[in-house]
Amino acid sequence: MNRSPARRWFWLWLALIWFTFTPASAQQEPFKRVDAMIPMRDGVRLNTHIYSPARTDEQFPILILRTPYGIGNATPSQLATAVPELTSEGFIIVQQDIRGRFNSEGRFVMLRQPRDPKDKNAVDESSDTYDTIEWLLKNVANNNRRVGIAGTSYGAWLAVMAMLDPHPALNAVVEQASPADMWMGDDFHHNGAFRLSYGLEYAYMMESSKEIGDPSEVIDTFDTYEWYLKLGSLANVETNYFRGKIPSWRDFANRPDYDDFWKRQAFAPWLNKVTAPTLNVAGWWDQEDFYGPIKIYELLEPHDKANQNFLVVGPWNHGGWSRGEGRKLGKIDFGSATAEHYRRNILVPFLVHYLKGKGTHGLPEAMTFRTGANEWIRHHAWPPKQNVVDRKLYLQKDKELSFDPPPPAAEQSFDSYTSDPANPVPYRPRPIKLRSGWTTWLVEDQRFVDHRPDVLSFVSEPLIEDVIVSGRIVANLFASTSGTDSDWVVKLIDVYPDKFESDPEMGGFQLMIAGDVFRGRYLRSFERPQAIPANTVQHYQIPFPANDHAFKKGHRIMVQIQSTWFPIIDRNPQRFISNIFLARESDFQTAIQRIYRSGRNASHIAVPVVVKPPQ
């Protein structure tokens, strides 16, 4: 089916396919381009563009950028304009369509599972990268036999795959927002809850065509909230739309639990050593893969004897580090050009140091941009260990929130709401358009749910001093449901003063700094879900991967709790069904949810608070 160029490029942009840099005024060094079909060990050939500096007075390192989204047809001058920071330093830049995509041969398998390293005849993205490096070293003139690989999102996942069975010449890996576990916390699931709208649209985009499919061919409604609600049972997706043509959807539907398929696809079994210097990059408001780079850093860190595993987290959405200044996201102003700072002062020095042997990268163990305070913080360890104390933010009566434990109560104290799958809470303001709003929804003003009776909001008094939260946050929810299954969504929010002098339009703004969901059926086991005992208090721990935020004096802290987040998260029937994808409309029911806040069932948010060092 033919697709217009405008549609194609929209979806390329949405998925952030390019590892790109914003053009900058710099003396550009010309490239010469050579196109090649590089053979893999099984005979499949991969479409590759090689851009080498025109000058030959020195040998240059090779930087590989692999993608499933199409490498395009950039001229040497266009590439020089697109990557000025790297152009001025001198790199051989290699772009490659992965197996089965665009002009490369073979069969595409989305997020192909790692092969057994002992099976030298099997192929995966690691072996394809190895074979590509081997060919480049032998066939590209003036290379210095040092190779790096970099990418964003899927491209970052490909970069991490290169580490599993690395070529000896691999000397640097830059993974920017790589997924690490598609069931636990990245694109397709969060703590067992299926990311419906993203999963459906992305799977269609990737698997309905060898190029880029357009989800508007399926979703023809102005407000996608309405389309997904009318969809009814998720079984209707396969019956009415996909009809066996989208393999990943079948995986979603047939493997709802954390089975060996998802575990083998995750990086946890494989990342047991640091095989190359690694720069892990994340964005605080990454709407797709915030969990991944944090998890990859944590998996590698115990094995990092040579101190070559680094973490950088900035105030970005998915791919925000690679384009523009990075001064604002939505309405949130960070006071400086954070993306430019990353590219010029972190990324390029890292690559130059490890691939050219020049200078020092100057990186600490971890570097985070502290939102609220709008400053870069250098850490000796992540999460921070010095000058940090664990504190608890307790839910209180009258929808208050404070660090003080609730007073003893003769009876269990709770707040309640009714959750209705027929009227789920939208995850962002409606209409939820297919072609806009996705990249900034995590920084939307959360006041759009103020009128909803199925959202509980607990808020503190105005702070008398700054409260800095840095590290891992865990929501401890003591809750019951009248049903036998339930989702629990918890959001931590910075509430701006009603009168915000520096920017009056931001008065009262509610900025979500952390939020996630937990599917109740997985409380005891992610592998073997169980019905929740009705009307019985259960303790749910909902982890947030990381945070570094300053709640400023005069601001307030808010915690919101709800049980639907639609359609980013599929609807829970609130009645235990062994496979929610097979739930019928008659299985969906309302449920009365209770959030407890006293005695041993005192719901709270555990936060690591930065304290002043002793004098």
Predicted regions and their residues:
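C-terminal, loop-rich substrate-recognition/catalytic regions characterized by aromatic stacking residues
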Residues: I219-A235, W321, G326-Q615
